[in-house]
A protein has these predicted regions:
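Short, flexible loop segments at the rims of nucleotide/cofactor-binding pockets, characterized by
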Residues: 11, 91-94, 122-126, 164, ...
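Small/aliphatic-rich secondary-structure junction motif
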Residues: 1-60, 140, 153-221, 240
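Gly/Ser-rich helix-loop-strand patches that form or flank binding pockets
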Residues: 19-21, 26, 93, 101-152, ...
């Protein structure tokens, strides 16, 4: 069962949705909740070429940025603490200094899942564009990562995109044993050009769920279209509250973010996505 959740916050609108989901799950499953804010010192203080005699200016600028970043991290962590208390959920708030992805991965060892926004802005003090924290965490996290879109739509049930293989099987097992389905129906979605292969894949996952008494249904799709397109279309039609996705085909899980299937799904998925570790 889900006993502890880590949510990593950066103060962005995407981060707000991640916080909402983390608080909801902590309340629903009576799980311990940890909220992490990271002061991105390595990026703020990184070496860079400066004109002769300008080193003092850079030092002063870096110190000002560090002070501002610290205040911002403390502010959104305080806001989160207030939100969680209002929801009746006790939360442990952690302020760290260092590389954001490394800090998240380190704290993940203490928890069952990591909740992270689909678009991350941990380098907020030095850049206005999204950073690569999510990709780095997906490659290195010892725990499943729940990738949250900017908006949290209403939904019910779970869709499991099951492609077979060791990593996909482990993802399904971890998801089920954490109890996150909470008794809702799990739709096992399998995709293949050959009908027999598609049905065989969905049957594998369905047998596992049946052995555990989990409500489920099989949905084998015969299609030559790109798998990401099929998955996203099904999610939009079914409107689940969660998508569970493991490795597809021959791609190892550590390289999931680099594969076209998972990258495309995570980029456009309208619901939170549970990605196995």
């Amino acid at each position: 069962m889900l006993r502890s959740t880590l949510v990593a916050l950066d103060g962005s609108a995407y981060s707000e949705s991640a916080a909402t989901l983390a608080i909801d799950w902590a309340y629903r499953f009576k799980a311990r909740l940890l909220a992490l804010g990271v002061l991105d010192a390595p990026t703020i203080q990184r070496a860079e070429p400066v004109p002769l005699g300008a080193s003092a200016y850079k030092q002063a600028r870096d110190e000002a940025r560090m002070t501002d970043a610290r205040h911002r991290v403390q502010s959104f962590l305080a806001d989160f603490r207030g939100r969680s208390q209002s929801a009746g959920v006790p939360a442990e708030v952690i302020e760290d200094i260092g590389d954001p992805a490394a800090s998240i991965v380190n704290e993940a060892h203490r928890c069952d899942v990591v909740v992270l926004a689909r678009e991350t802005h941990f380098h907020f003090e030095t850049q206005d564009r999204p950073d690569e924290t999510l990709a780095q965490v997906l490659r290195s996290s010892p725990r499943p990562v729940v990738v949250v879109p900017r908006e949290l739509p209403e939904g019910r049930g779970v869709v499991v995109a099951y492609g077979g293989g060791r990593e996909a099987s482990r993802t399904l097992q971890t998801f089920h044993l954490l109890g996150i389905a909470a008794g809702e129906t799990i739709e096992v979605l399998s995709i293949h050009r050959d009908r027999a292969q598609a049905e065989a894949l969905s049957h594998q996952a369905a047998e596992y769920l049946a052995a555990h008494g989990a409500p489920h249904r099989q949905h084998a799709i015969v299609s030559a279209a790109p798998p990401a397109e099929v998955i996203l279309e099904r999610v939009r039609h079914a409107r689940p509250r969660l998508l569970v996705i493991g490795a597809h085909g021959y791609h190892p899980l550590r390289d999931l973010f680099a594969t076209s299937v998972t990258r495309a799904v995570l980029r456009a998925c309208p619901v939170p996505a549970f990605v196995g570790a």
